[in-house]
Amino acid sequence: MSTLNKYKTLIIISSLAAVSSCSWFSAKDGTEDIDDRYMKSQQDLELQVPPNVKQIEVQDRYRVPEGVIITNRNAKGKALSLDPPQLLLVGGDGVREDSEQSHPTVWVRHQDTPFMNYVSRFMMQKNIPVISSTEKQISSDWISDEDEDIFSQYIGSYNLDGQRHKVTLEIIGQNANEVAVQARNTQSQRLVDDKWVTMNTSKTVASQFLNAFLGFYDTERTKEARERILEEGTINVSLGTNSQGQIALIAERDLIAIWEHLPSVLEDLNLSVSDRDQSAGIYYFNVKEPETGFWAWLWGNDETNAKVDMEPGDYQIHLAATTYGVSMTFKDEEGNLLDSNLVTKIYPEFAASFKSRGK
């Protein structure tokens, strides 16, 4: 054992012994810490209401005008659905629920490949029978819990035996960066006395079907991103300027590749991603306070400290396509450009991390 380790061990043992001895010398029955003054308190005068104050009168000031037809009332009593609640898989990056829709709907971030290609591949991979398909909609035939295919376990598992369902996936909205996907349980039947009897459709069945697709979509996108990174190889980063002439890091790669690569680079530099906005091309990250003091010196653990020389706080990285590739412009929490000297200082660490990530 080295001399330094012996000193560290001796300091730890001495500290523990000192704390134990202090607690033993000060030990009492604990009554000195009890404040029992409340037991001696006396009741004061009752609250006096001023003479000009009248009794509060509760009135319905928001009456519905006569002749108004009320629609879309929330279900009550027996009209409530007996289906168990089913949450949508919106925890992943780029997926958000559209709660204003009457059927389970999510907005999925998507820009390149036609989205319906993933829907068709999903139906094919899961061996789901298809009865109709268009550029924006695909509908299944009956999916039964008695099907041999494992996909039948994804829907109706909470229901009685002998049920079958038809489900439709449809693109109901689209913008530059997102696609709105909706799932509907169009038909449901139950087997009663060897006859199929129509039953109420279920939002839970639709949600489970949509969740199955979202899981497939996320897996496929992750696989494609990994293959793209392996094919593209090393990412070279240089110091340059963006399209506005501001100092920035320049990567000779397409925007999607850098966007997908940047989280692993920040993690490698011990910089935590706090948020992201792909539509605006912005990553938000945080530089934590370095661990200092006696215990940090004692254990000598610098693995969690930031590997770049930046002040603790919140920062932004703005990505934009340029003639030569992608520019990465660094800004502070308020959106102000970082000093060019600071960007020059942190450039080598970012360049080295990008290069190692691409191998």
UniProtKB/Swiss-Prot annotation:
Its gene is bamC
According to UniProt, the name of this protein is Outer membrane protein assembly factor BamC
Function per UniProt = Part of the outer membrane protein assembly complex, which is involved in assembly and insertion of beta-barrel proteins into the outer membrane.
Source organism per UniProt: Kangiella koreensis (strain DSM 16069 / JCM 12317 / KCTC 12182 / SW-125)
Please name the InterPro entries in this protein's record. BamC (IPR014524), BamC_C (IPR042268), NlpB/DapX (IPR010653)
Q: How does it sit in the membrane?
A: Lipid-anchor
**Which Gene Ontology terms of cellular component type are present?**
cell outer membrane
List where in the cell it is found.
Cell outer membrane
Tell me which family the UniProt entry assigns to this protein: Belongs to the BamC family.
**At which residues does the record annotate a lipid attachment of kind N-palmitoyl cysteine?**
C22
Q: Where is the lipid attached (S-diacylglycerol cysteine)?
A: C22
Instruction: State whether keyword Membrane applies.
Output: yes
Keyword terms = Cell outer membrane, Lipoprotein, Membrane, Palmitate, Signal
> Out of the domains of life, which is the source?
Bacteria
